[in-house]
């Protein structure tokens, strides 16, 4: 089992570089499922849009999604890995919103080797998270949200399970168009380990702010992530994004993730380069019933990813 896990984790180095410091499991939960969030650097918890994928970043944002909205997502990740998601949102009265969602990562087929690095076969690996989301207007302009999730992971014949919650809070001032959020993600733990040792959840605390300017069709966003790791430098917490709002329904965005750029940098001194990792771009159209959002980014110096979201309100 140790050889299998080692080969598996090594092939996904880009996902777990920083996570390995705390030996966390289920690091697919760190990846964005929202194309809009991905376009703005990969981390955003404050954009207020009728976009069902945004509630995977902050459960409080489910309150902005139209009644009876279906959303699906797909990302070609790296090394044959594919990341997918789906959701359904339903409003309950004027203040409450409920949703169900699923996140699925398929890592494809990989080599299984023995202690001498001799191939003995192949194995598949995948992660699944099934989620229930609830958002409620706590006060004027303030919405709270919670996501309860069941996670299971398969590496060959080995399986682990976990339960967790996300807690989100958003304050949105529509006249000045300020949005501020606080989110705690992946609070919980394993209920079944691969073997004897129980792993940790990829817990994260994030704070974010977005501001749309009345005189300009521009929205700026800043998000601080991994605030439980006090020893990181400030840049490793920072994610910046900008939206150009072409109309009420159409946006173009770009972002920069300082930590990802630093982690993906290869080479030494003047020859060091992240090969574009850290930068991301995207765009979308959110009509009354139909939504389409796309983002391009590099989660590894040697590969690129495209994330697509589709939504439809019945």
Mark where each language-model region is:
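Positively charged n-region of N-terminal signal peptides that target proteins for export
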Residues: 1-4, 140
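Sec-dependent N-terminal signal peptides
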Residues: 4-13
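Sec/Tat signal peptide C-region and signal peptidase I cleavage site
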Residues: 15-19
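Subset of outer-membrane beta-barrel
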Residues: 20-314
